[in-house]
Each structure stands twice: as C-alpha cells, then as structure tokens.
Amino acid sequence: MTQAIHLLQSVRARREQTHTLGHVLDDAGKTYPIWPVAYSTENADALRDLVIREGARRTLEIGLGLAQSSLAIIEALCKNHAAGSLAADAHTVIDPGQAWCNRAGVRELDLSGARTVTRFIEQPSHLALPQLLASNERFDLAFVDGMHLFDYVMLDVFYCMRLVKPAGLIILDDHWMPAIQTVLGFAVTNWDAKLELFDPKGPARRMVAFANPFQDEQRPWDHFAEFSAQTLPEYPWKRNQPRGAPIPA
C-alpha cells in the first residue's frame, strides 16, 4: 500500500466520522458544529471531485476553518497520487484566524494524518501570498475561502492567478455574496475569465471556478473595463441578500 493510499483511507475515515458526529472538538473538548461554518459532506465531496477531475497534485487554500474543505482537497490529492506519495507541502493552507475555534481545524489535520502533507501558514493571506510568489511557488489549483470582504478577496484572487499554473483552476466559495460577485465581475470583464457555474440545486452550488487566464501581463498599461456583479453571466445569483440571512447549504 502506497503512502498516498494509506493517507487517503485515514482522511476519508476522519471525514466520515466527523460528519456523522456533526461537530469537531478542540483539545479542551469543546464542540464546534460543522454547520454553518464548514462544508457539508456533499459540498466537500463536490470540491474533492473537482480537484480529482483537474488531476491537481499541489494545491493552495485560503481559509482553514474547521478543516473540512482541506480534508476534501487532501483526499483528492491522495487519489491523484495513488501510485506514489505526497510531498510534505502537497497542500498549503493559509489562515491566521484559528483562535475562534481554539485551533480545532489544525487538530482535524493532525487527527486525520493530513498534517503530514500540509504546510499551514498562520498569517493573513495578504502577507503570506506575496511571500509564496517571491519564492517562485507554483500550484495546480487554488481554493479561495478566506476573508469575504471585497478588497481581501480581490487580493487573494490577484495573487492566486500568479501562483496557479496557466489554465489551472481557481475556485471561490460563497459566490452568492455581493463582494464575491463583484470580484467575479472584474475577473470576467478585465481578465477575460470564463466562469464555470454549477447546478444551483447540486452539491457544488456554493462554488464558482475559472481556469486561470493569467500568463505574462499583456494588457495595455492603462487597460480598464467597467465592471459590476451585473456583468456576470445568467445564473440564479443571490443578489440583494440581506445581512444575517442564512448561508445556502
């Protein structure tokens, strides 16, 4: 049995156990419900299947939370490396905000065995991503689910486009939020990104993805196209979502 298969079994078992319980624990025994903070099983499986589909072998994630999306990505990496082994930094996840859950997300990585192939960067993404770029890091795929403020998401996507290989997939969560949609509006009009939208009633409904269009900068120095969420393709986008409304499952 290869290292990848052994880890796949361990991660899958941990995911199944966690979602059966419906919560994770911190080291002090305090419980943190999976919903609404983390991905449900079907959402996480949809993310896993996207990573498998892309054949990604090195991935980047912004936002650890309770680690359910991380474990789904790592399960996919194990599948894509099934004949061999994963490097100690096969998956990089950036999250400075584990204090709210007393590092329960990190604990999930440890208990599943996924920490052995995960580089956890406990810094804000606007500090960590430029460092990765300066180190000439390269990833096959990125999953963006960190701060959901427009300026933070814009920076995350900007750097991911320079860190992910050309045509590699960049996935964003929570596309129903106005800040995410506005970033997508810019991506469509100014970067010529082609959005991949999923069945709004299916398990991937929270996500939107696009193949990284970035190569060497070829736009005129003063290029700019007007943008807004209204420039997005037809889709049941959840515009005008009131504050405090429940997050789609």
Where would I find each of the regions flagged by the language model?
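Mobile, glycine- and charge-enriched loop segments
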Residues: M1-D45, L141
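S-adenosylmethionine/decaboxylated-SAM
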Residues: K30-A249
